[in-house]
Amino acid sequence: MRRLGTGIGWRPEIADAVEEMPGIEWVEAVSENLCPGHLPDSLLRLRERGVTVVPHGVSLGLGGADRPDAGRLAALAERAEALGSPLVTEHIAFVRAGGALTASPSLEAGHLLPVPRTRDALDVLCENVRVAQAALPVPLAVENIAALVSWPDEELTEGQFLYELADRTGVRLLIDVANLHTNHVNRGEDPAEALAGLPLEAIAYVHVAGGFERDGVWHDSHAHPVARPVLDILADLASRVAPPGVLLERDENFPSGDELRGEVEAIRVAVEKGRAAATGTGAAAPTSGTGTDAGSGADDAVRQRLGLAQAALLSALVAGTPVPEGFDRVRLGVQARALAGKRADVVGKVAPELPVILGARYRPAFLAYAQDRPMTGGYRRDALDFVAHVLRTAPGDEGPGVRRELREWWLERSGPVPRSARPGARLARATRRVLLRR
């Protein structure tokens, strides 16, 4: 596997700090946030300096019951080619469920949800990975995710599941050591056992990220400093194999450039500590490495069984339907609140005017709206539906100015074409909003 070195997740909010950071050999950018024909100047400058850029996808849903969407695969391939990337990465997760396969409404999670570690789910995942590999111009690596909930009646450990996936498909692995720590706290899984079961030579690179613990639950926030136990797991991994690359992820609550540099240096120190204590202990590399699948394929009946199970879980999380048998109700409640909170955050970024218009009332109003109203059409549609809900159901105590602004916002964006593309009209509306607040 090509050596990448030490890297950091590129985000627009820290673009300047990343460019100025010494010793950064590569960066990773969220694929869905990039437009191939209009790449950010910061990424272009990094590329000109010889810094490798890897697109990191979050929306394929390779662990879902449906086959990967051709349009999403084409978009990921286009970004890899535009960036000259040596590989692309995605997640072992499902992000949507329902639809034609299960004859039920389509539901979007808005986040990465765990795949059951069963033979059925593994068959589906392997086939989906092969579909993706055939559509992509560069190698694919897939990431283990953090989980707040456990599926009942799982048949494989995480190490076994990942080993078989790599063995049957030849796919590379992106190992997130922060997610191993998350699963240790939330699911009682031993990170050392997981590492011992991994095909270490299949590792493409490693993620490191921060989080926090609340009421015995670890939240993989990507908004807090990297915890010592996560660095210890990284050192353990590095004692078993020299990872081709290690990357710091930070998505929210960005610290100063100096603090980011300190976190990157702590990662380097952990890797060096691990290499000094190298043991070389891990599972043997998959014997084929070519993707010769020794398992059975995923027929429609297998996909339907998995689809029904995933739809039932997702519906309980985002639509308030009963908790499926065998799941921990308390943990599902934590996961449901986390999904709703993330949804509120993303809608607030997609439609930044709404938190401004509603002020402190935005978040509680959105969480109340999302409690039993699943997202079905993406975040922009969700923002429109939320405002329509507020206008329809709110008692009117926001004040006439707030309701007027919400109504204008909704009318401006609800049609196929904005009501007015004239700069003068937009300026007049913006001026009126300012005057209303005086």
Swiss-Prot record:
Region (UPF0276): 1-273
Domain of life: Bacteria
Signal peptide: none
InterPro entries assigned to the protein according to its UniProt record, in alphabetical order: MbnB/TglH/ChrH, Xyl_isomerase-like_sf
Pfam family, one: MbnB_TglH_ChrH
Region span, Unknown: 274-438
Region called Disordered, residue ranges: 278-297
Family from the record: In the N-terminal section; belongs to the UPF0276 family.
PANTHER family per UniProt: UPF0276 PROTEIN HI_1600 (PTHR42194:SF1)
NCBIfam families referenced in this protein's UniProt entry, alphabetically: PRK05409.1
Protein name, UniProt field: UPF0276 protein SCO6045
Organism of provenance: Streptomyces coelicolor (strain ATCC BAA-471 / A3(2) / M145)
